[in-house]
Each structure stands twice: as structure tokens, then as C-alpha cells.
From Swiss-Prot:
The chain crosses the membrane at residues 7-27, 37-57. This is Negative regulatory protein YxlE. GO terms for cellular component: plasma membrane. Keywords: Cell membrane, Membrane, Transmembrane, Transmembrane helix.
Length: 62
């Protein structure tokens, strides 16, 4: 099986960037919808969708 890294590498970079940005945002937020440990687990365990869920559902509106 030959892996085309030209197609996969941008997705890996996107996933890592989203996860890091979401984790930093989760840590810095004073209040979230649900416990922070739960959001950290979702961000880390559910690729690409976890960080998107945090930004759409997890953050409290100011």
C-alpha cells in the first residue's frame, strides 16, 4: 500500500493545529459548557471533529 503523503500531510497539520489551538483555548476559558476535562478528552480523542465541537458547543457565549 503506497501512501500519498502530499495528500495526508496537510490533514495531519490541520488536525494538530486545531487540537493545540482548542486545548489552549479550553485551558484559558474561564467558563465552558461542561467540565474542562471532558472537553480536553473530546478534543484529543475525536480527530478534527473534537476541536470543532469545542468551538461551536463548548465555549460559553460572552
Amino acid at each position: 500500500m503506497n501512501i500519498s503523503w502530499e495528500m495526508i500531510l496537510p490533514l495531519i497539520v490541520l488536525q494538530l493545529a486545531l487540537a493545540v489551538f482548542a486545548l489552549i483555548s479550553c485551558i484559558k476559558e474561564e467558563r465552558t459548557n461542561g467540565p474542562k476535562w471532558m472537553w480536553a478528552a473530546i478534543i484529543v480523542c475525536i480527530n478534527i471533529i473534537g476541536p470543532i465541537l469545542f468551538f461551536t458547543v463548548g465555549r460559553k457565549q460572552r
